[in-house]
A protein has these predicted regions:
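Conserved C-terminal helix/tail region of periplasmic/extracytoplasmic solute-binding proteins
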Residues: 416-528
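Extracytoplasmic/periplasmic substrate-recognition and gating elements
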Residues: 272-274, 278-279, 315-394
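C-terminal motif of bacterial Sec signal peptides marking the signal peptidase cleavage site
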Residues: 22-23
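Glycine-centered hinge/linker elements that transmit conformational signals in sensory
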Residues: 205-207, 252-283, 329-330, 334
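Hinge/lid segment of periplasmic solute-binding proteins
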Residues: 39, 111-176, 218-219, 320-335
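Extracytoplasmic/periplasmic solute-binding protein
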Residues: 159-172, 177, 200-256, 297
Length: 528
């Protein structure tokens, strides 16, 4: 072979190597997980656990203690913890690691994300066989810890982890959204906080709060800054409003119904109250708790898992304490369209187990994941925020009931706002719902929130939000999130943005081909 052809062949080989590394969004073609007859304790196992904490050192300590206690029970299983503060970063890193065959063993995640992970062949282990195993399943005879039996799992929470005919996760914690209300300001405006907030009430009070003094300060707080109604997660806002209105969002099979007339009406209402200064969002203005605690917000909607940041006496604050304003805080369900039939979202982290070539490694991973359902872990972690344990075993335990009974005893572990947020979900679990999970549901959720964000931004920029604007916005969201490619039944469309590593490898591939072409052209001219 002539020298130029040898060099070209080497460059081509490099290209093919790069192509192999990029994969097809990580389709490694693992064999389906098969449950071993028993756990091989003669071996050592090293498993990785990717977890999220809410910038809360108590949560980190619980993860570390859980690992230490589990390893004491199973000396041959070593758990390596990697902490994140953002679910989106976990999602992106998992996608990247699917492409390179280096996923973690156990991961805190959301079902919407798992639906995308499943586009890799047998990438996530289905858990039904593990649930039912007599030795190592729920309440298994060979387990060295006291975990929940199958009937002690809260059915609704467990069902949230099932899609495509199988369970691909177990619930870890559950929360919902709550409206944290500055009762002092509501009453100063001449209103009383009802037991169940309605959207009409919140909009009316928020508009009343925009009144100003002659010097430009707001009458209700005497400050230059006030956002009466501030929403943290606008995807949840849109989803819950559609559910309360009985309007479409998506079907279980993945048919998208978001872009309807009810959505159009919601966005026009958002524009109306944004224009008056009564409404804004976290992405645009900032963290609701900061505004609430500074006396610059009246209705702050955030997760019950953020309750320790809410209120004048909150144990966690993200502003200078001298900026705190004293007021009475009330915790309520999110605003409702029909107070007699409330609807609110169920959310919170779940745990999935990734498939591996070695079934014993998967079983070891499952045993650790299931350990996170023990009372010791469930109760301890639930106490860090307004979370609720996902097992009846933990919820009904004397330790957890004692914790709930001590509401307001102090402003740390028993902070009143936090416990009221937990009780809100415990009392209204039957009023919660989840959206359908399919490949593309994560993108649909993002689009739902972005509709509100872009409408709010446009209004603040003095744009007119009319039907023509909304038609254009619908088209933009469909294109941006590739919603026209999401197929009913959860096909291969909409795998989310390609990870940066894969983009880099594809760039290398293109550069290598270009070098081949340039080299061959140079060689041809040289020989002439």
């Amino acid at each position: 072979m002539r020298k130029p052809m040898k060099i070209a062949a080497l460059l081509l080989a490099a290209c093919l190597a790069c192509l192999g590394l990029t994969g097809c969004h990580g389709d490694r073609g693992l064999s389906a997980f098969s449950m071993p007859d028993s756990f091989d304790e003669s071996r050592d196992y090293e498993i990785t656990f990717w977890a999220k904490n809410d910038t809360n050192k108590n949560q980190v300590a619980i993860y570390e203690q859980s690992i230490e206690d589990f390893e004491a029970l199973y000396p041959g299983i070593h758990v390596n913890l990697r902490l994140y503060t953002d679910y989106g970063k976990i999602y992106n890193d998992v996608i990247t690691n699917i492409a390179t065959g280096t996923t973690p063993n156990v991961c805190i995640t959301y079902p919407d994300h798992i639906a995308t992970y499943l586009t890799g062949s047998n990438c996530v282990a289905p858990l039904d066989a593990l649930f039912a195993d007599e030795k190592y399943g729920f309440g298994g005879s060979e387990l060295r810890y006291d975990g929940p039996d199958a009937e002690e799992m809260i059915p609704q929470f467990l069902q949230e982890c099932a899609f495509g005919g199988a369970h691909y996760a177990i619930p870890y914690m559950r929360s919902t959204e709550a409206c944290y209300v500055n009762k002092t300001y509501v009453e100063a405006l001449g209103y009383q906080v009802p037991d169940v907030l309605t959207w009409d009430f919140v909009w009316e009070v928020s508009e009343a709060a925009t009144a100003k003094n002659a010097d430009g300060t707001y009458r209700v707080n005497g400050q230059n800054v006030l956002i009466p109604f501030l929403y943290k997660s606008t995807d949840n806002m849109m989803i819950q409003l559609l559910a309360q209105a009985g309007a479409g969002y998506s079907t279980a099979s993945g048919d998208i119904q978001l872009f309807n007339d009810t959505t159009r009406g919601i966005l026009k209402t958002v524009a109306q109250h944004t224009k008056s200064g009564a409404f804004s969002t976290f992405k645009i203005s900032g963290y609701p708790a900061n505004f609430l605690n500074a006396g610059q917000c009246i209705f702050a909607v955030d997760s019950t898992a953020g309750s320790t940041w809410m209120g004048s006496d909150a144990p966690l604050v993200d502003i200078d304490r001298e900026k705190l304003v004293q007021f009475e805080t009330e915790v309520r369900m999110i605003p409702q369209l029909d107070p007699e039939n409330p609807k609110m979202i169920s959310q919170g982290p779940s745990v999935c187990v990734f498939n591996k070539d070695d079934p014993q490694e998967v079983l070891a991973s499952w045993m650790f994941a299931q350990y996170l359902l023990t009372n010791e872990v469930q109760i301890a972690y639930a106490q860090t925020e307004g979370y609720v344990p996902v097992t009846a075993k933990a919820q009904n335990s004397a330790a957890y009931q004692d914790y709930l009974a001590r509401e307001g005893e102090d402003n740390e572990a028993h902070y009143a706002v936090k416990l009221q947020a937990s009780k809100l979900l415990l009392e209204h679990t039957g009023d919660t719902f989840v959206t359908a999970v399919f490949n593309g549901s994560a993108s649909l959720r993002n689009a739902a929130g972005q509709l509100i964000e872009d409408t709010t931004k446009a209004t603040r920029r003095k744009q007119t939000v009319d039907d023509a604007f909304l038609d254009s916005l619908y088209s933009e969201m469909t294109s941006l999130y590739r919603l026209d490619q999401v197929s009913a039944g959860g096909g291969k469309a909409d795998l989310g943005p390609l990870p940066g590593t894969a983009k880099a490898l594809l760039g290398t591939l293109a550069a290598a081909w270009a070098l081949i072409g340039l080299y061959l052209l140079w060689d041809r001219r040289k020989r002439k």
